[in-house]
Swiss-Prot record:
The lineage of its organism: Bacteria, Bacillati, Bacillota, Bacilli, Bacillales. Pathway: Cofactor biosynthesis; molybdopterin biosynthesis. One of its GO terms (cellular component) is cytosol. One of its GO terms (biological process) is Mo-molybdopterin cofactor biosynthetic process. It comes from Staphylococcus epidermidis (strain ATCC 35984 / DSM 28319 / BCRC 17069 / CCUG 31568 / BM 3577 / RP62A). It comes from the Bacteria. Keywords: Molybdenum cofactor biosynthesis. The keyword Cell inner membrane does not apply. Belongs to the MoaB/Mog family. InterPro entries: MoaB (IPR012245), MoaB/Mog-like_dom_sf (IPR036425), MoaB/Mog_dom (IPR001453), MoCF_biosynth_CS (IPR008284). May be involved in the biosynthesis of molybdopterin. This is Molybdenum cofactor biosynthesis protein B.
Amino acid sequence: MHKHQHQNIHLNRPIHVAILTVSDTRDYDSDKGGQLIQSLINQHENHVDINHYRIVKDDIEAITHQLKLWLTSSNQLDVIITTGGTGISQRDVTIEAVRPLLTKELEGFGELFRYLSYTEDVGTRALLTRAIAGTCDSTLIFALPGSTGAIKLAIEKLIKPELSHLVFELNKDIRN
């Protein structure tokens, strides 16, 4: 496939998404990050169904439990996006919960995200993020920081432009 063909991929079905906010302080009314992800991802050119939206505490067992529930559900998810818990404080454990579940890590996501964060958003504070992405079988997982600026950057510049292509690639041998 040539570059221009990747940009024209349109799936003949909705993209099924789950959003997980990781925070000790947010609830559904105050969770600006989770709400922003919903808003931005719904603007994707392909139809998107937000199948699940949850908030869990900054606790590795709680995060892992919720992710495993979604990953083993009979309703196949295409994408899980987490927000929060990607920094360097003792309570930031999202990466420790996500990484062991990944079949393949998309190293380029974290590299590009930190580069764009450095050049377009927070400068050298980009060093503090450990945002990652990868796959767990045929599900994409993105672990994003909790700040709305970081969420907007990741969704607009990295996730939305490649979402249909990523979902297509993960499912072409399974569903076609």
